Curated annotation (Swiss-Prot):
Coiled coil: none annotated. One of its GO terms (cellular component) is extracellular region. Its main location: secreted. It comes from the Eukaryota. The modification Leucine amide is found at L30. This is Rothein 3.2. Lacks antimicrobial activity. Does not inhibit the formation of NO by neuronal nitric oxide. Belongs to the frog skin active peptide (FSAP) family. Rothein subfamily. One of its GO terms (biological process) is defense response. Expressed by the skin dorsal glands. Keywords: Amidation, Amphibian defense peptide, Secreted. It is found in: Secreted.
Length: 30
């Protein structure tokens, strides 16, 4: 279970990073 949780956490991070980068770009564009 802990291994699966770690993988899920890693997936969440990789999915969130591009989103956060996009938000940063939008804020800089303002």
């Amino acid at each position: 279970d802990s291994a699966a949780g770690a993988v899920r956490a890693g997936d969440d991070e990789t999915l969130l990073k591009p989103v956060l980068n996009s938000l940063d770009n939008l804020v800089s564009g303002l």
